[in-house]
Amino acid sequence: MLHQYTMYIREFLLHRRIDREGGVVEKVSMSHEDYLEAIVMLGGSQTQPVRSVDIATKMGVSKASVSKAVTSLKNSGMLEQPYYGDITLTEDGYKYGCAILKRHEMLTRFLVEKVGLSEEVAEDEACQMEHAISDESFKKWLAYFERIGL
């Protein structure tokens, strides 16, 4: 199971720092990472379209907030949306969203199984941690998870 997470995390770390031409790019904002994660959760695949209203409901935000985030994520090449159509992730957007989701799931599992937090508290904490820890720290977390068999 850890190998599955490691694959997504490595892909995430690559996409987070390097563009197709090999240049360094800025990390997607924490808010936009949450949108990508939510779209992956709602769609389940790269090709499954997702409605803006469903994203708004899942995230507890307004449709206007979703529209603003979608515009920004379209401009960064993470998703596609025809004029007033459903939202579909690009390959890069899907990989990034999957990596964030897997990172979140792994941290949640650790907080529940090894730290003893309730599922609800662990979910909230993992959501904060997935954005806050550095890539270097997370690589060390991965190594630790491997050692303890998580």
Regions from the PLM with identified roles:
Residues 85-104:
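Basic, amphipathic "hinge/linker" alpha-helix immediately C-terminal to the N-terminal HTH DNA-binding motif
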